[in-house]
Amino acid sequence: MYDGSDVACYDQLHLTKRNFHDLCTMLRERCGLRDSVYVTVEEKVAMFLLVVGHSIKMRMLRGTYKRSLWTIRTHFSDVLTALLSLYGEFIKLPSATAQAPNDYKWKWFGNALGALDGCHIDVLVDVADQGRYRNRKQAITTNMLGVVDWNMKFLYVLPGWEGSVSDSRVLRDAMRTNRQDAFVIPKGKYCLVDAGYTNGEGFLAPFRSTRYHLKEWAASAQQPQTAKLYNLRHSCARNVVERTFVLFKKKWDILRSQTFFDIKDQIRIISACCVLHNFARDRQHVMDDLLLHEVDSELANAPN
């Protein structure tokens, strides 16, 4: 599949041929991933991408690759570990001098890092733990904090919290000073947040009790004023985090499916998918843009 057409490679592995081979080279040179006696790095990475991209069960890969289940599991684990070793390189805050683009969405928020919110991702846990992981929509999820920039790249993620936990509680945990991977907003910078978070240093929320909907204003010639205008501009820019989450879960289907991995491995897989997401965003391709059009269409037709 990675030696065929670009379209076939993207459909199966969610990366173009060039990006797939670039990823394999990176995992070889920087992470120490090696060919085994019978399995190349390319085959290992392809098996991993099939599992996370299509939520294919490893047993299904036995017939395709003529490998034992033990071999597939071992190589999946090796690729997962290799990707996680790149976490600090791909998921990090920008330099202190980075500025938001001067476009119609972000020119009002020049010192913004981007936007943040919580993202619920399906997980499978023991029956005894399901109450803690059940969110307000009754789904069994982990609540992941995601901070994204204007290019839809993750700057910081914290998966692992139970789905019943509020977004603000996850953010407080991320900012604990005794965390080795604490989320620290550089002085003079801030993130756009929704009304569920508190306005304060480093966080810019919309005016409360002011109604606004992007679709309503887009269809009207009337211009909103004062607080409504601010909230409209805020929402237009902050929408990047919602677009990112939808794209993230659409591209890596394992994030929308309950899998039979241990919960700790499920969280590690989420982090690895964040690395893959940023890797792909750094190497944008027209096929990624087509997928993004699907995302925007879904959001445009979603109920308010």
Language model features: what each stretch is:
Residues 33-41, 256-263:
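Short, surface-exposed loop/turn segments at secondary-structure junctions
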Residues 57-304:
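Short, well-ordered secondary-structure "scaffold" segments embedded in the functional core
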Residues 18-22, 46, 243, 247:
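Generic alpha-helical secondary structure signal
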Residues 1-35, 85-88, 290:
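Charged, often Cys/His-bearing segments associated with DNA-binding zinc-finger transcription factors
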Residues 16, 47, 61:
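Short alpha-helical segments in extracytoplasmic peptidoglycan/chitin-binding modules
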Residues 27, 31-34, 51, 55, ...:
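Structural motif corresponding to the C-terminal cap of alpha-helices
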Residues 42-54:
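Short, amphipathic alpha-helical "recognition" segments used to contact nucleic acids or chromatin
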